[in-house]
Amino acid sequence: RDFPFTGPYPEAVRDYKEAARMAIYYIHRMPAIQSWKTQTVPDMSYDHNTYPCKIIGATIRNEVLVAKEFPLLADEAIAIAKNAATFLIDMSRPEDAPLAFFPPTYYLNYVNSKRDWNQGKTMTLEACAAGHAFLDLYDYTGEQLYYDRAVGIADTYLKLQGEDGSYPIKVDFVTGEPVNDVKAMLHPLLNYMQRLRSQYGLTK
């Protein structure tokens, strides 16, 4: 089929990097992000914070980028990132639990977190998002706590892997038992483990 696009096209207003810088700055200035400067719990007026691994993990990663791209905002951005990371750590399963070091997929009763089938459950591979966030924060701050959390998540994944190499897509957040027979797509975990291997030399 022919592509439906036809020129001529207007010139770009700005290049990709500048557009990306504007985007991360916009996110940084959002009230729900700014609230992390003084809080270690999410502002639930932004109800997507109901997904800690995905959204709060992304908040941490965004703020590390802000610190790199806007040096005058670095202290503020890293304060936000650290408080968001504190929340993820506080919400994570303890070290002796089946899902040790995993933050939850769902938090409180907003959007899909309120569904009966999601209460007390977690999407197995979402902890990778939190792991990447901890690694980004470690890279910037050099604080061992964040690296150790990321490695702890990886260690738990090794324990969860089935004999056939698969992972359940969704498990009980306390027991770690699968809630159905569906298996997860593994690319988030492969990317996470590859980062640990290539960037930090971690092989397990």
Where are these regions (language model features)?
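Low-complexity, Ser/Thr/Pro/Gly-enriched N-terminal "stalk/linker" regions
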Residues: R1-A58, E76-V111, G162-S166, K204
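Well-ordered alpha-helical scaffold segments within catalytic/enzyme domains
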Residues: R1-V13, G57-D75, N118, C128-Q144, ...
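Alpha-helical junction/boundary sensor with strong preference for TPR arrays
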Residues: P31, F70, L88, S92, ...
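Short, recurring structural edge motifs at helix starts
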Residues: Y46-D47, N118, E177-P178
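Structural signature of alpha-solenoid helical repeat scaffolds
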Residues: Y51, N118, T122-L125, G142, ...
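Acidic/His metal-coordination segments adjacent to aromatic residues that form catalytic metal sites
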Residues: L108-W117, V171-G176
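Solenoidal tandem-repeat scaffolds enriched in leucines and small polar residues
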Residues: E143, A150-Y167, V171-K204
